[in-house]
Amino acid sequence: MKKNNQSIDTLVLITNRQLLKDDISLATYGVALSRGIERIQKYGKHCINHTEESSLTYNIRRAYRSTVKANLHSTKLPDARADSAEPDNWMRNHSSLYTLCRDTDLPFEEYLQLCDAIGDTVVHHGKVITNREQLAIVLATAKRIHLPTNLIRYWQSEQEELWITLQQHFHDITMWSTVHNEDDIKLLASLGIPNLEYVLISPIFPTPCKTGHPGIGVKRGKELLKQIQTHYPQVQGIALGGIHEHNYQTCLQHSITGVAIMSDFMKRVHSHIDI
């Protein structure tokens, strides 16, 4: 009998188009992301993107028509059963799904277009914000904002005006951050963030993104989560770094709420690109 995959409470998909081998347009990338996310949202029941065209920006909408509608029959993926051996099958058994848009090298307007294409699951990354006008736009539109501890330190020292403005809106936003060590915990504890929802704890396992780092391991990750929860009892931990099908369950067995994946997710996104 086939063993069922353990349920993931919270699954975080992380975008990074630099992992794609092909040089594609932003519009095509947005459509591929939307497809990949929808597939995982539907617990393996694939369907063509049903996002209403009116909710998409002009560039994304134009690509939607050309790459989805015009090629409907050629682009439709095979139907997938819940018990099939699809590469992303393990990602589908989740309760909550978020997509952290990490393509912060994009110009600000293009970044916002990509977030629009991702849809309701999107978490905006604070690194894309460089001035008060941009901060105001993100504060007005984003449901969640991810501010890693290294970015917080940078804003405090080099972008003080941005940091002060953000603090004035602490009660209006839901924030995410990162925890790598005790220094990060001390920093977050000193801030008293009212709505700190998740912290990404990393790197749990070795990952090409941090060459030479052995990973902190799941036990260390659990210890860091317990420490941050003494200051933020409501905060949940997400394991990040080297997470894949064969090790994610180990994280869940150590009191970590969920897992974040980038490489495996971007492989699935690549499979949704029409070359």
Whereabouts are the PLM-identified features?
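Conserved N-terminal beta1-alpha1 strand-loop-helix module at the mouth
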Residues: 1-52, 59-67, 71, 83, ...
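Short, flexible/disordered intra-domain loops and linkers
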Residues: 20-26, 157, 210-215, 271
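Active-site-adjacent beta->alpha loops and helix N-cap segments on the catalytic face
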Residues: 105-117, 133-134, 148-166, 207-225
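Alpha-helix-loop-beta-strand connector modules within alpha/beta enzyme cores
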Residues: 117-124, 169, 177, 216-238
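Generic beta-sheet signal
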Residues: 131, 148, 178, 201-202, ...
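Glycine-rich phosphate-binding active-site loops on the catalytic face of alpha/beta enzymes
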Residues: 149-155, 200-212, 252-275
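Glycine-rich adenosine-cofactor-binding loop
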Residues: 235-247
